Amino acid sequence: MATAQEKHLRNVHQLTFGGQNAEAYFSADGKKLIFQSSHGDVKCDQIFIMNIDGSDQHMVSTGKGRTTCSFFYPDGKRILYASTHLASPECPPKPDYSKGYVWGVYSGYDIFTASPDGSNLKQLTDTPGYDAEATISVDGKKITFTS
């Protein structure tokens, strides 16, 4: 956490323990976080939501394939993320890290939206290749993504 010499960060708290946890983003009301995690029985990154204090962590993605790049829509009524679960329910192989950090550009990624509890899953992209890294406009009417 923050060291005694740290001048810019205060009230720093660890919210996740164990596994690999990444890419956490706030809901517009500041009450929740959405993030990707692999831990315990979850061997491949999945999308989770938790309260801002770290309580009530729960998976909202399908539990299949690999997921990444999740966000809340501004109105809080939907979430957005990329997943490989339709290409294969299995976890894709990890990239070769022997030459340093690399991002797994899996051709099976497509972009999905869902309710914050994971229900009402809707596929937004269905093209061959990598569709991920989506972000949402401030008004929630547009998304942009890498393809």
Segments (PLM) and residue ranges:
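A short beta-strand motif characteristic of beta-propeller blades
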Residues: V12-L15, D56-S61, N120-T125
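Solenoidal tandem-repeat scaffolds enriched in leucines and small polar residues
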Residues: D117-S147
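Hydrophobic beta-strand positions that form the internal "hydrophobic ladder"
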Residues: G30-I34, I79, I143
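A flexible loop/linker signature enriched in serine peptidases of the S9 family
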Residues: Q20, S37-I47, S61-T67, A82-D110, ...
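Blade/loop signatures of beta-propeller domains
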Residues: M1-R10, Y109
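Residue-level detector of Asp-centered blade-edge/turn motifs that repeat once per structural unit
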Residues: A28-D29, P74-D75, V138-D139
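Short loop/turn segments that connect beta-strands within beta-propeller blades
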Residues: N51-S55, S115-S119
